């Protein structure tokens, strides 16, 4: 089930009041239009008739029933509370949710990326490993650039990685490379399990035994 609410905002440019929709819970199957807005980022954007645009920051629980996955975008201050909530669901939840994956993210970019990974039926653990290998390669090729974040997204059916930092760069991600990493680490990933709540760059660094510094 999806849950949304209306809020009224005032445009700081023209002063006009507008109603916006805040999605507290978004079900991918029940709301395909809003799912696409999440994928392209517009669901977190306010656009006034005068042309003014601004970001909207609000937490969201994203539910993809097809992939048996819930992703919760929360503030850093709410992480522990969300961890406890997911622990309770695992302990007392309905039987059909026993094989669900639960993830916690603390940025809109990370939520959009998780949604894109689910949309393409990929494993976010494998994707984090792929991104880490690309990060190391790009850092070696461009040591002068600071890379703050690497994000997976798709465009026109093409898999891409975006490098955000002192300079924005984009690289194509061949399907074959993803499959190579998936197969190479399949046994270790199976052994590690898929119950982690925080599957991100730090997880990938720890999984590969790299120095987090």
Where are these regions (language model features)?
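Context-gated lysine
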Residues: 6, 13-16, 33-35, 91, ...
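Domain-exit/linker segments immediately C-terminal to small folded modules
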Residues: 47-127
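C-terminal, charged low-complexity interaction regions
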Residues: 129-213
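N-terminal cysteine/histidine-rich coordination modules
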Residues: 1-76
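A broadly tuned preference for mixed-charge, low-complexity surface segments
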Residues: 26-29, 60-71, 110, 159-162, ...
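General N-terminal targeting signals
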Residues: 35-39, 63, 71-73, 78-79, ...
């Amino acid at each position: 089930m999806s849950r949304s609410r209306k809020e009224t905002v005032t445009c700081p440019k023209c002063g006009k009041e507008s109603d916006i929709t805040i999605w507290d819970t978004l079900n991918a199957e029940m709301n395909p239009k809003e799912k696409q807005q999440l994928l392209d980022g517009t669901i977190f954007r306010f656009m006034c008739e005068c042309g003014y645009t601004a970001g909207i920051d609000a937490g969201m629980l994203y539910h993809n029933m097809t992939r048996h996955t819930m992703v919760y975008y929360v503030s850093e201050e709410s992480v522990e509370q969300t961890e406890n909530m997911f622990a309770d669901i695992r302990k007392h939840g309905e039987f059909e949710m026993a094989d669900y994956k639960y993830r916690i993210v603390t940025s809109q970019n990370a939520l959009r990326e998780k949604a894109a990974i689910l949309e393409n039926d990929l494993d976010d653990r494998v994707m984090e490993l792929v991104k880490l290998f690309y990060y190391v390669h790009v850092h070696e090729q461009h040591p002068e650039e600071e890379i703050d974040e690497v994000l997976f997204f798709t465009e026109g059916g093409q898999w891409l990685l975006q490098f955000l930092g002192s300079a924005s760069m984009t690289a194509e991600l061949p399907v074959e490379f993803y499959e190579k990493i998936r197969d190479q680490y399949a046994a270790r990933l199976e052994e590690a399990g898929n119950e982690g709540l925080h599957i991100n760059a730090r997880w990938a660094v720890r999984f590969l035994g790299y120095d987090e510094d």
